[in-house]
């Protein structure tokens, strides 16, 4: 890929990190050398990835090349959505208010809470016996 007519955005969600390159095309979405439908088996994950493009009505006008690392399916889909949003803002700054209103610009900062000593999980306490 040439850097001449492409835009780039990095997206993160939970422990996933996605690098998104967009360039004018006909709507091909390639994730780690696989198509969107092959990479994500769940329709909900595919919908999450397409959301920013559908919002700004550029779904069939841009080609996306994406690499993603870490995390699970949901985290990767969220990271890709965040990366696409950032790349779209670099592509056309006038799209920012619409993307911001939809909540795609803000990085979802929620992380897995750590397990504490003396507890079974992060908050699950051992069963209490009164007698």
UniProtKB/Swiss-Prot annotation:
GO cellular component, one term: cytosolic small ribosomal subunit
MF GO annotations: RNA binding; structural constituent of ribosome
Highest taxon, organism lineage: Bacteria
One BP term from GO: translation
Presence of the UniProt keyword Cell membrane in the record: no
InterPro entries: Ribosomal_Su5_D2-typ_SF (IPR020568), Ribosomal_uS9 (IPR000754), Ribosomal_uS9_bac/plastid (IPR023035), Ribosomal_uS9_CS (IPR020574), Ribsml_uS5_D2-typ_fold_subgr (IPR014721)
Keyword set, alphabetical order: Ribonucleoprotein, Ribosomal protein
NCBIfam families in UniProt: PRK00132.1
Family (UniProt): Belongs to the universal ribosomal protein uS9 family.
Descriptive protein name: Small ribosomal subunit protein uS9
Native source species: Actinobacillus pleuropneumoniae serotype 5b (strain L20)
């Amino acid at each position: 890929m040439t850097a001449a007519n492409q835009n780039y955005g990095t997206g993160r969600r939970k422990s996933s990190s996605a690098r998104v390159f967009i360039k004018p095309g006909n709507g091909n979405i390639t994730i780690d050398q696989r198509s969107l439908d092959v990479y994500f088996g769940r329709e909900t994950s595919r919908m999450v990835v397409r959301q920013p493009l559908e919002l700004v009505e550029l779904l069939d006008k841009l080609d996306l090349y994406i690499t993603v690392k870490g995390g699970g399916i949901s985290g990767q889909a969220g990271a890709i959505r965040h990366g696409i949003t950032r790349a779209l803002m670099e592509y056309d700054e006038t799209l920012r208010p619409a993307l911001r209103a939809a909540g795609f610009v803000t990085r979802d900062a929620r992380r897995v809470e750590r397990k504490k000593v003396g507890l079974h999980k992060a908050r699950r306490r051992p069963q209490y016996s009164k007698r």
